[in-house]
């Protein structure tokens, strides 16, 4: 069966996530990249910045109306938080049937948008045209908490450490290797956007304390969970194994996963299940690549599901 080529454009392509998106699109047999928008790189060949893409397309500096005028079948918005609305409004007006996937926080609380964490929200992708990609930490938190959600006796406490690519490309203390050297930088220790996101999605309060580390990519999340009743390690491990048995991107491991082993990989590792005396407090560790499963890979899963393709197409 011949599958018709679907056109796609990326807005905000200079960033780390944009680069990963270009690689995935280049590997996709059914997608044709028709525009890549970046003010800073306008006029330069995409292939000069991304070896995975070898065609002649050049970066363009496109405002919202120019993006809408391209009339692509799919548009992925990889913009900093607070910048998506003009693009969405222009697409809504010009080509409402365009599939829009937004990677920012801007629409994660909007009930008109589908919240796309496939392993937990796979049920109703068909026909969706507006999909909000979860946050990187929010993805790790939800996947770690969900198998024990019905057993919680109080708010999970989540201690997160991310590589500095999570702070984007705009210079700041949180992506300055000199300031991060031999350092761990805490920030937004209460009311972080991902804390609110996870609390809203799971329907329980969650406490989250993020930190930035000197490595470039990858998240380690250590989650402390209090349980209503004692459970054995085997019972807890079985909950994770059964919940994610059919999820190829989620690997349940025995020991606590290392962030160095997940960097550059598309999936999530969850493990290191450790019980405190009394078996009513458990600690679980998750790792994922913030640029991949925390952003670009998840966007590609969402795209594939919304268009009725195999979920892992282009995800090697």
Swiss-Prot record:
One of its GO terms (biological process) is L-arginine biosynthetic process. SMART domains: Semialdhyde_dh. The active site is at 136. It is found in: Cytoplasm. GO terms for cellular component: cytoplasm. Belongs to the NAGSA dehydrogenase family. Type 1 subfamily. This is N-acetyl-gamma-glutamyl-phosphate reductase. It comes from Xanthomonas oryzae pv. oryzae (strain MAFF 311018). The lineage of its organism: Bacteria, Pseudomonadati, Pseudomonadota, Gammaproteobacteria, Lysobacterales. The gene is argC.
């Amino acid at each position: 069966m011949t599958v018709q080529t679907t056109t796609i454009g990326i807005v905000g392509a200079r960033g780390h996530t944009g680069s990963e998106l270009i690689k995935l699109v280049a590997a996709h047999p059914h997608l044709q990249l028709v525009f890549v928008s970046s003010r800073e790189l306008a006029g330069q060949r995409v292939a000069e910045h991304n070896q995975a893409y070898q065609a002649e397309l050049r970066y363009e500096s496109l405002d919202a109306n120019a993006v809408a005028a391209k009339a692509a079948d799919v548009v992925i918005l990889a913009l900093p938080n607070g910048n998506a609305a003009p693009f969405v409004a222009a697409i809504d007006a010009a080509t409402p049937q365009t599939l829009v996937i937004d990677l920012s926080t801007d629409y994660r609380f909007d009930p008109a948008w589908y919240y796309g964490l496939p392993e937990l929200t796979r049920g109703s992708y068909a026909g969706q045209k507006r999909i909000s990609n979860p946050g990187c930490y929010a993805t790790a938190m939800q996947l770690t908490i969900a198998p024990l959600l019905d057993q919680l006796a109080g708010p999970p406490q989540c201690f997160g450490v991310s590589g500095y690519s999570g702070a984007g490309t705009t210079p700041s203390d949180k992506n300055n290797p000199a300031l991060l050297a031999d350092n761990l930088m805490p920030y937004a220790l209460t009311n972080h956007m991902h804390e609110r996101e996870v609390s809203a999605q799971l329907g329980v309060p969650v406490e989250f304390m993020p930190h930035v580390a000197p490595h470039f990519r990858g998240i380690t999340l250590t989650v402390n969970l209090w349980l209503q009743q004692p459970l054995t390690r085997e019972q807890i491990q079985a909950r994770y194994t059964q919940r994610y048995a059919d999820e190829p991107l989620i690997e349940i491991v025995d020991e606590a996963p290392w962030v160095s082993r997940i960097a550059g990989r598309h999936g999530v590792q969850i493990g290191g299940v450790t019980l405190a005396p009394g078996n009513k407090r458990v600690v679980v560790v998750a790792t994922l690549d913030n640029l991949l499963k925390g952003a670009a890979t998840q966007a590609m899963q969402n795209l594939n599901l919304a268009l009725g393709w195999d979920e892992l197409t282009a995800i090697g």
